[in-house]
Amino acid sequence: MSRRQSRKSAMQLIYEMNMNGDYDKQRIEEFCKYQNINKNDIEFFKEIVLNFIEHIDDIVNIIENNTKQWNLDRINKLDLSILQVGVCEILYVESTPDSVAINEAVELAKEYSTEKSYSFINGILGSVLKRKENASL
């Protein structure tokens, strides 16, 4: 599994968690068995999802603070999951350069979401990065 595939799998599991309201770490192992994810390629996937679960409140607050005039309930659930993966990588996954995290989130949006979503996601993650660089998160 490539890092891109790991992100895709993380997005899928986070989407499921958001839809079910179940953020239990046990879901990771169940998802891996169901998806038949290779043990050698699972570390990056787990790093994203575990950081998401650990920091979910902060990630949600950061997204809310960077979506001007948007209530999170108005954001497509898939787009929200992509944003959560992107914010998680920018803030908590040190092995991923910030620009790569943003680009990969945009690519996920282009592949799996609506035509307008990728620019929306790019804008929000760009704002998150600017605040991080200015240390105002």
From Swiss-Prot:
Coiled coil: none annotated. GO terms for molecular function: RNA binding. InterPro entries: NusB-like_sf, NusB_fam, NusB_RsmB_TIM44. Gene3D superfamilies: NusB-like. GO terms for biological process: DNA-templated transcription termination; transcription antitermination. It comes from the Bacteria. The keyword Transcription regulation applies. The keyword S-adenosyl-L-methionine does not apply. Keywords: RNA-binding, Transcription, Transcription antitermination, Transcription regulation. GO terms for cellular component: cytosol. HAMAP family: NusB (MF_00073). Involved in transcription antitermination. Required for transcription of ribosomal RNA (rRNA) genes. Binds specifically to the boxA antiterminator sequence of the ribosomal RNA (rrn) operons. Belongs to the NusB family. This is Transcription antitermination protein NusB. It comes from Finegoldia magna (strain ATCC 29328 / DSM 20472 / WAL 2508) (Peptostreptococcus magnus).
